[in-house]
Amino acid sequence: GCGGNGLVLSATDSRACRKVAVKKIVLSDARSMKHALREIKIIRRLDHDNIVKVYEVLGPKGSDLQGELFKFSVAYIVQEYMETDLACLLEQGTLTEEHAKLFMYQLLRGLKYIHSANVLHRDLKPANIFISTEDLVLKIGDFGLARIADQHYSHKGYLSEGLVTKWYRSPRLLLSPNNYTKAIDMWAAGCILAEMLTGKMLFAGAHELEQMQLILDTIPVVREEDKEELLRVMPSFVSSTWEVKRPLRKLLPDVNREAIDFLEKILTFSPMDR
C-alpha cells in the first residue's frame, strides 16, 4: 500500500521471526527529506501500546542509517505489521457501539502519550489509525506530518497548505493554519468517533469554505473573540443569532446521548474548551 509519504510493503524479519511493514521513503528533494527527517526523529522517541512500533530505520540495501539522511536517496522504516486500518474497517460498514468505544479509548490513550511527549500528530484520520483484528488493538501511525510542540524546537510553525485532510481539520486550523495546539488532534479524534458510530464522515466539505460552513451549522460559537474573528473574516457564514441549524443531537439522531455528550465536549469551536 501507500502511506502518507511513501510506499509500504509487508516483509518477514528472518532474524526476529516476525512479519513487519517496511515503509520506503524516497528522498528526492528537500521537502521529502524534511518530512522524512521529521518522521524519523519523532518515531524513534515513541514507545507505547497504542503507537505503531518502529524497529529500525535503514538506508539503501539495509545499511545502517547513521547521522543525517542527506547522503541517501532512500530510507526504509521497518515497523510493526498491522493487518488493517480504520478506513478499511469503516468501508465494510458501521462499527458496533462497543467496538467504537474500545477503539476511541485506545486512540485517546495513544494521543495522551504523544501529547505528553510534546508531539502533535496533525494528520489524524482513519487511514492513519491501524487495527489488529485478532486482538482489536488500535495503534496510531504515519507520523509524516507530526510536529514537535516545543517552543525551543526550531520550526516556523506553519502547516503546509493542503497537507492535512480537510474533513478532520478543526475550525481553528481552517481559520489560521499557523496557529495550532494539541487540541487539533482532539478535534480530529471527535470526528473519527462520529464516523465510527455512523459510518459517515461528520463534516465532508468539498473545500475549506464549505468545511467551515458545515462546522458552523452544527458547532456553536461561544467565545466573543471567535465571534469577532468570524464577523471580520467571513460574516456571511454566521447567523445573526449565533444559533446553529443542526446541533449534533439533530445531525446524529441515532447516536446515544452519552456519546453525543462526549462529542459536544471534544468538538468545541474554541480549542481552549476542548
Swiss-Prot record:
<dbReference type="InterPro" id="IPR008271">
    <property type="entry name" value="Ser/Thr_kinase_AS"/>
</dbReference>
<dbReference type="GO" id="GO:0005524">
    <property type="term" value="F:ATP binding"/>
</dbReference>
<keyword id="KW-0418">Kinase</keyword>
<keyword id="KW-0539">Nucleus</keyword>
<dbReference type="GO" id="GO:0042803">
    <property type="term" value="F:protein homodimerization activity"/>
</dbReference>
<keyword id="KW-0067">ATP-binding</keyword>
<keyword id="KW-0597">Phosphoprotein</keyword>
<dbReference type="GO" id="GO:0046982">
    <property type="term" value="F:protein heterodimerization activity"/>
</dbReference>
<keyword id="KW-0723">Serine/threonine-protein kinase</keyword>
<feature type="short sequence motif" description="SEG motif">
    <location>
        <begin position="160"/>
        <end position="162"/>
    </location>
</feature>
<dbReference type="InterPro" id="IPR050117">
    <property type="entry name" value="MAP_kinase"/>
</dbReference>
<comment type="similarity">
    <text>Belongs to the protein kinase superfamily. CMGC Ser/Thr protein kinase family. MAP kinase subfamily.</text>
</comment>
<feature type="modified residue" description="Phosphoserine">
    <location>
        <position position="160"/>
    </location>
</feature>
<keyword id="KW-0963">Cytoplasm</keyword>
<keyword id="KW-0131">Cell cycle</keyword>
<dbReference type="InterPro" id="IPR008350">
    <property type="entry name" value="MAPK_ERK3/4"/>
</dbReference>
<dbReference type="GO" id="GO:0019901">
    <property type="term" value="F:protein kinase binding"/>
</dbReference>
<dbReference type="InterPro" id="IPR011009">
    <property type="entry name" value="Kinase-like_dom_sf"/>
</dbReference>
<dbReference type="GO" id="GO:0035556">
    <property type="term" value="P:intracellular signal transduction"/>
</dbReference>
<comment type="function">
    <text>Atypical MAPK protein. Phosphorylates microtubule-associated protein 2 (MAP2) and MAPKAPK5. The precise role of the complex formed with MAPKAPK5 is still unclear, but the complex follows a complex set of phosphorylation events: upon interaction with atypical MAPKAPK5, ERK4/MAPK4 is phosphorylated and then mediates phosphorylation and activation of MAPKAPK5, which in turn phosphorylates ERK4/MAPK4. May promote entry in the cell cycle.</text>
</comment>
<keyword id="KW-0547">Nucleotide-binding</keyword>
<dbReference type="GO" id="GO:0005634">
    <property type="term" value="C:nucleus"/>
</dbReference>
<feature type="domain" description="Protein kinase">
    <location>
        <begin position="1"/>
        <end position="274"/>
    </location>
</feature>
<dbReference type="GO" id="GO:0005737">
    <property type="term" value="C:cytoplasm"/>
</dbReference>
<feature type="binding site">
    <location>
        <position position="23"/>
    </location>
    <ligand>
        <name>ATP</name>
    </ligand>
</feature>
<dbReference type="GO" id="GO:0106310">
    <property type="term" value="F:protein serine kinase activity"/>
</dbReference>
<dbReference type="GO" id="GO:0004674">
    <property type="term" value="F:protein serine/threonine kinase activity"/>
</dbReference>
<feature type="binding site">
    <location>
        <begin position="1"/>
        <end position="8"/>
    </location>
    <ligand>
        <name>ATP</name>
    </ligand>
</feature>
<comment type="subunit">
    <text>Homodimer. Heterodimer with ERK3/MAPK6. Interacts with MAPKAPK5.</text>
</comment>
<dbReference type="GO" id="GO:0004707">
    <property type="term" value="F:MAP kinase activity"/>
</dbReference>
<dbReference type="Pfam" id="PF00069">
    <property type="entry name" value="Pkinase"/>
</dbReference>
<feature type="active site" description="Proton acceptor">
    <location>
        <position position="123"/>
    </location>
</feature>
<protein>
    <recommendedName>
        <fullName>Mitogen-activated protein kinase 4</fullName>
        <ecNumber>2.7.11.24</ecNumber>
    </recommendedName>
</protein>
<dbReference type="InterPro" id="IPR000719">
    <property type="entry name" value="Prot_kinase_dom"/>
</dbReference>
<keyword id="KW-0808">Transferase</keyword>
